[in-house]
Amino acid sequence: MTQLAIGKPAPLGAHYDGQGVNFTLFSAHAERVELCIFDANGQEHRYDLPGHSGDIWHGYLPDARPGLRYGYRVHGPWQPAEGHRFNPAKLLIDPCARQIDGEFKDNPLLHAGHNEPDYRDNAAIAPKCVVVVDHYDWEDDAPPRTPWGSTIIYEAHVKGLTYLHPEIPVEIRGTYKALGHPVMINYLKQLGITALELLPVAQFASEPRLQRMGLSNYWGYNPVAMFALHPAYACSPETALDEFRDAIKALHKAGIEVILDIVLNHSAELDLDGPLFSLRGIDNRSYYWIREDGDYHNWTGCGNTLNLSHPAVVDYASACLRYWVETCHVDGFRFDLAAVMGRTPEFRQDAPLFTAIQNCPVLSQVKLIAEPWDIAPGGYQVGNFPPLFAEWNDHFRDAARRFWLHYDLPLGAFAGRFAASSDVFKRNGRLPSAAINLVTAHDGFTLRDCVCFNHKHNEANGEENRDGTNNNYSNNHGKEGLGGTLDLVERRRDSIHALLTTLLLSQGTPMLLAGDEHGHSQHGNNNAYCQDNQLTWLDWSQASSGLTAFTAALIHLRKRIPALVENRWWEEGDGNVRWLNRYAQPLSTDEWQNGPKQLQILLSDRFLIAINATLEVTEIVLPAGEWHAIPPFAGEDNPVITAVWQGPAHGLCVFQR
């Protein structure tokens, strides 16, 4: 049998050099590491990794080739109270594997044991890693590098975006390849999108609980191999990487950036009763935050929390991010539950991973977006991330919904959110683009459901409607559910128009949820993470609707307004913004706090947003000048208005002079 040479301790993972494969694995507490190679018949061959440099185990297998399937068995103590759960009976995934062969099924053999180890061997059913070789012709690909001030983000799910698209070939619908199809790219361009933000594409697993209910993890926030693409989104698992890069190359040629939603806060191994796939069996004590009793700190709500203050885990996370940028040319990341990235365990702006990103010449140059919270004490960190990061602005989301969907909100609070929440983000040299403004996202009601449902309807998730937030700030306008009288439909449409206008004409970086622009509904499900069906797949039959045209017109209008694209904080008297009451006069202190929800926002001295969010038709006196309503608010008969606009209830209009 061929013996392993010592090899090199870097880089991490399995790397083919044309003559063989170098294998490396981090484990600070292991006593022995076996590399397990599987031939075409499934026969296993084991080799001890002979090299041990610091905490890195390594070895080199001559004559090994791409396509080789492998895994690890890691020997060490079984001491749960101290956080050690080594079990060499279980085959483990390389955390840096680039491709996985096999499925992560709910099976007792994929568990290591709770208090006592389960020594039943699982190699016959455990997924295997695959050695890959990286040769790809990027041609003249270059990142679009869209300025933050001009960025329009479109959040989408790889499968759900195209699975029902009638103009995309059936054989590629719901795949990476479909993202780069001309039909999809033309749609995004016509809409005005500059950045496609994808829900997780790294290999993930469905939780055992969901599998037992006949459901699956649809969103993908349950990672198991952070360097490997999820194979279900590929036409062929063997070509997944090239399919993904082909799509990115095509999107780049159209000037569209690609941002990946990435999950660095927890793994699919869940709590102590969860499966054993990789990190828990490699070095549980190093990879996770461990309590004094040996259990996990569950700061994510998913059972475990990655210890991103440990130097080796920081190196792992940094290498993962660099891989996606350097190998796949992605343009940025949205970090799920990103407060975990700054835990030491308390949250710090100079936490090790933040510092590593700041100092990296690759990662410091891409777009970085934080979901700025986790569920631990002190986990709400909106506005507190390092200057390189933009952040999801939930203040904006809640204020926009409260203002337009009939909840009490003072004009001052609304204006503050409209002005990029400067009270939150104007610090440490940050710009207005640091505020990622959103009204909806994958997590929560869709925009249409915000105006059709007062309550969540998550029964299909199998948790008796207990899951999902109850703080929706929604308004069904008098009837729970879709459909209704013509008057009801029109009132809901007006609310959708108002929310979209607020989102797309506010200062900050707007993020649009895919499908909101043509009225996609999840029938009141505000936590559709396990619904891989028509509830979440976009119905493109409405894509040519008036709402789609309305949204596109708003985006193109935004790009014409200097105050919104110059990415500078608005200051008193700088000509960027004036806040006026219904009589075209500056608002008084009392009006800001107690006045009716009527407001005029003059941007760049030429564009006027007139707002009447009250229940009554109201005359709005426009500032001096000749004003025209502009698309998408202009009708066929578009006379010059010099004095008064009849503002309908819950209405708004945009004018230009």
UniProtKB/Swiss-Prot annotation:
The keyword Hydrolase appears for this protein: yes
Pathway membership: Glycan degradation; glycogen degradation
Name the UniProt record assigns to this protein: Glycogen debranching enzyme
Enzyme class per UniProt: hydrolase
Record-stated family: Belongs to the glycosyl hydrolase 13 family.
InterPro entries, A to Z: GlgX_C, GlgX_Isoamylase_N_E_set, Glyco_hydro_13_cat_dom, Glyco_hydro_13_N, Glyco_hydro_b, Glycogen_debranch_bac, Glycogen_debranch_GlgX, Glycoside_hydrolase_SF
Gene name in the database record: glgX
Keywords assigned: Carbohydrate metabolism, Glycogen metabolism, Glycosidase, Hydrolase
Free-text function comment from the UniProt entry: Removes maltotriose and maltotetraose chains that are attached by 1,6-alpha-linkage to the limit dextrin main chain, generating a debranched limit dextrin.
GO biological process, one term: glycogen catabolic process
Segments for region (Disordered): 460-479
GO molecular function annotations of the record: glycogen debranching enzyme activity; hydrolase activity, hydrolyzing O-glycosyl compounds
Entry annotated with the keyword Hydrolase: yes
Annotated catalytic residues: D336 (nucleophile), E371 (proton donor)
E.C. code: 3.2.1.196
Catalytic activity reported: Hydrolysis of (1->6)-alpha-D-glucosidic linkages to branches with degrees of polymerization of three or four glucose residues in limit dextrin
Intrachain S-S bonds: none
Annotated site residue numbers, Transition state stabilizer: D443
